[in-house]
């Protein structure tokens, strides 16, 4: 019989490892030791400087996977915290620490739920964990690489639960069944620097950049898509490195981000930005360079038995139906969708990445109960 796991104490042990991306600081060792103690076959997968772990209990199908990350964002102003960000103090029933919400407590909760299911003999197929140390960073050597390796090896994962903090206002009020895609673009306009009194001897990059950004901003990308918000474009930076009042600058730069629904693909949007750049630069003596970076495509896990199972498990614990949503930012679910249908369910995300990130202890235990209900229903 497997040993019981205290989800709160395991959360605290993980938080005490200051695993700010890309550092691991022993966090993955804690997860591996815990799962190995339950009888999981654990496999460390290191890509670059990033530690990853794939662990599986059982060899039969179906294989229900939990995906999460041990890395966390920086603390910020440590003096602004009421407690040490990595001390994992519990104050008035609330666990305070970086990773309490996003998302070390979810890893601990699913490990505790898995231990419970294994002890009760409920796992008639397999339960697995896909844990990375590269979700909060550039995410190139984490889940993406692990998924590519598992696909190449023919590892079968049938469904996946991601432990991101999906609850919006109250515990269990929201489950994520998809995500919008994301593309960043850097635009560099290179002109010819010169004196403002002699514009014919220069090529001002600023009007070109302004025309381009206006054209991009003025277009309504769409009016939404079933289950999705309308796509939106946001200019995130404009830089003209010129402090003189009598000089036409030589360069102008901007960055933008588009969060898009399935009406678009990242490549189609990159092509559109490039086409608009060519129009804005018509007759310009300089050069316009657009550098796009597609972070992920929009995806949706269609409503069906798996989404219904997860929603029912949440209702088992909260008594209320959760909203099935595609709102918010990107997550590693965008990579896992290549393996299997994926749903995200976790704690309330209100304090993630903030000073005094915190999670009520009772909500960590309720999350364990939700995960236990998912496992029980899955193998029923």
UniProtKB/Swiss-Prot annotation:
GO terms for biological process: diaminopimelate biosynthetic process; L-arginine biosynthetic process; lysine biosynthetic process via diaminopimelate. Transmembrane segments: none annotated. InterPro entries: ArgE/DapE_CS, Bact_exopeptidase_dim_dom, DapE_proteobac, Peptidase_M20, Peptidase_M20_dimer, Peptidase_M20A. Keywords: Amino-acid biosynthesis, Cobalt, Diaminopimelate biosynthesis, Hydrolase, Lysine biosynthesis, Metal-binding, Zinc. Zn(2+) 1 binds at residues 69, 102, 164. One of its GO terms (molecular function) is succinyl-diaminopimelate desuccinylase activity. Its cofactor is Zn(2+); Co(2+). It comes from the Bacteria. The keyword 4Fe-4S does not apply. Gene3D superfamilies: Zn peptidases. Zn(2+) 2 binds at residues 102, 136, 353. Pathway: Amino-acid biosynthesis; L-lysine biosynthesis via DAP pathway; LL-2,6-diaminopimelate from (S)-tetrahydrodipicolinate (succinylase route): step 3/3. Belongs to the peptidase M20A family. DapE subfamily. Catalyzes the hydrolysis of N-succinyl-L,L-diaminopimelic acid (SDAP), forming succinate and LL-2,6-diaminopimelate (DAP), an intermediate involved in the bacterial biosynthesis of lysine and meso-diaminopimelic acid, an essential component of bacterial cell walls. PANTHER family: ACETYLORNITHINE DEACETYLASE, N-ACETYL-L-CITRULLINE DEACETYLASE. NCBIfam families: dapE_proteo, PRK13009.1. Homodimer. This is Succinyl-diaminopimelate desuccinylase. The lineage of its organism: Bacteria, Pseudomonadati, Pseudomonadota, Alphaproteobacteria, Caulobacterales. The gene is dapE.
């Amino acid at each position: 019989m497997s040993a019981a796991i205290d989800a709160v104490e395991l959360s605290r042990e993980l938080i005490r490892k200051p695993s700010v991306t890309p550092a691991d600081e022993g966090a993955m060792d804690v997860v591996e030791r815990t799962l190995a103690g339950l009888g999981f076959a654990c496999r460390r997968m290191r890509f670059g400087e990033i530690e990853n772990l794939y662990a599986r209990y059982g060899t039969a199908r179906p294989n229900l996977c939990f995906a999460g990350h041990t890395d966390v964002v920086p603390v910020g102003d440590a003096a602004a915290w009421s407690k040490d960000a990595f001390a994992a103090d519990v104050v008035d029933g609330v666990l305070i620490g970086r990773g309490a919400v996003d998302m070390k407590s979810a890893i601990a909760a699913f490990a505790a739920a898995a231990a419970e299911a294994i002890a009760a003999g409920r796992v008639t197929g397999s339960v697995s964990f896909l844990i990375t140390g590269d979700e909060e960073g550039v995410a190139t050597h984490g889940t993406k690489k692990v998924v590519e390796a598992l696909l190449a090896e023919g590892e079968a994962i049938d469904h996946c639960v991601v432990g991101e903090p999906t609850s919006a206002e109250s515990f269990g009020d929201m489950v994520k069944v998809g995500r919008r895609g994301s593309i960043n673009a850097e635009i560099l306009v290179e002109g010819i620097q010169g004196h403002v009194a002699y514009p014919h001897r220069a090529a001002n990059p600023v009007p070109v950049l302004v025309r381009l950004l206006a054209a991009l901003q003025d277009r309504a990308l769409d009016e939404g898509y079933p289950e999705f918000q309308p796509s939106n474009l946001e200019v995130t930076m404009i830089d003209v490195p010129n402090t003189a009042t009598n000089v036409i600058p030589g360069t102008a730069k901007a960055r933008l981000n588009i969060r898009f629904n399935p009406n678009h693909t990242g490549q189609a949007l990159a092509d559109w930005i490039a086409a608009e750049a060519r129009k804005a630069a018509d007759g310009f003596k300089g050069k316009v360079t657009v550098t796009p970076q597609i972070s992920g495509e929009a995806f949706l896990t269609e409503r069906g038995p798996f989404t219904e199972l997860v929603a029912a498990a949440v209702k088992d614990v909260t008594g209320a139906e959760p909203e099935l949503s595609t709102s918010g930012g990107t997550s590693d679910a965008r990579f896992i969708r290549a393996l299997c249908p994926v749903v995200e369910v976790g704690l309330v995300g209100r304090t993630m990445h903030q000073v005094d990130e915190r999670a009520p202890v009772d909500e960590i235990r309720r999350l364990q109960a939700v995960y236990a209900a998912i496992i029980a229903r899955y193998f029923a």
